Amino acid sequence: MGELWHIKEGTEEEFPGLIGVDGYTDSSIRTIVIESTITDDTDPMAKANLEEYKKVVVRHEIVHAFLYESGLEGNTNEIKNWSQNEEMVDWIAIQFPKILKVFNLLEVL
């Protein structure tokens, strides 16, 4: 990325920015914060594999950080803030392991 970022894990009480989300990126202090209790035992729709889901959340927030470090966080207003589009960021975060596997297989890194 070029700059040192920190990844913290905590609760909504420790990090109010987590209210309603599983993670967020604070570009002003180069910090990624991930919810440490991404589970609700009373929710029948809760994720079964929380460790894998947390990895996706961390990758998602890292994509946001890379977009910020690339100067794209605030410079995409002409195209409806595409760099902050959650679907696009999710796509990169979810597909990256597959893309990396193909790049490694083809030895194109």
What are these regions (language model features)?
Residues 65, 69-74, 96-103:
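Amphipathic alpha-helical interaction segments
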Residues 103-109:
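Long, well-structured alpha-helical subdomains associated
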Residues 56-68:
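Active-site recognition of the HExxH zinc-binding catalytic motif
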Residues 1-54, 68-69, 78-94, 109:
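Active-site scaffold of zinc-dependent metalloenzymes
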